[in-house]
Amino acid sequence: MKETIFTGAAVALVTPFNPDMSVNYEELEKLIEFQITSGTDAIVTCGTTGEAATLTDEEHVKVIEFTVNKVAGRVPVIAGTGSNDTAYAVELSQKAEALGANGLLLVTPYYNKTSPRGLVASFNRIAGSVKIPCIVYNVPSRTGLNILPETYYELSKTQNIVATKEANHDISALIKTRELCGDDLTVYSGEDTQTLPIASLGGKGVISTFSNIMPKEMHELATASVAGDLKTAQALTFKYLDLMNALFMDVNPIPVKQALNLMGFNCGHCRLPLADMSDEQIAKLKVEMAKHLQLA
């Protein structure tokens, strides 16, 4: 049985920007403190929600370093270092390890998507270049590449490929993956709304967008789900479902950044090609947020 990096809810943290679109490190520190004091179980930096795709190489490394330093060992820090260029992913992963990241999040190759054989070779090359645990990330709606249960089985043989962030919405495939891999591959939900269903199949939590705005509540939902407290987990899922879905009425992380701004944080805008929400969308988001949160 492999060691689990975290159990519960890890926040897929946004990257705040200044008006000139540079990284707002002062606000990033505030977000980190908000997460830790609210009970988040881990912090994922430079993932999809962190707009890693539009960070420069220098920014990417600096955000990882800043996050590790400010967290200061209070919760695990997982750095997004995946790429469709395996050599670059190796380089970035080694830098993240040297900076003190506790684990890596590795998205599947995208655009130049590969075969299952190539996927295993790529992930094994990256994992073999570091000693810290790696979480692979399956999000075919973005990458055009889906990890099959049989491929997961091959990946689970690699010692430091310890988990997957699963966002393919295929419960049947997940059941097969759990059957094949057992405790050699931890499963985390990659969708807030799927936390309870995936936990019922042995999942250990969620890497969450929703945690950006309600970390305490997402921690409680994930913890109840993993513990098998069905009554509590169901009640919390039902309670927050509409707000979770509202955070995806536009391309992630556009709505969640807007939500944080409405809460009084200063996260700024997303970098292009991600454009601001429409006034109509913002109005709908406010309605859902007002049911649970105090708006600025």
Where are these regions (language model features)?
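Catalytic alpha/beta core domains of metabolic enzymes, predominantly
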Residues: G128, R142-F248
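Alpha-helix N-capping/helix-start residues
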Residues: P19, Y25, D57, P149, ...
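Alpha-helical structural signal in soluble globular domains
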Residues: K62, F66-V71, K95, L99, ...
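Glycine-rich phosphate-binding "P-loop"
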Residues: N138, N160-I161, R271-L272
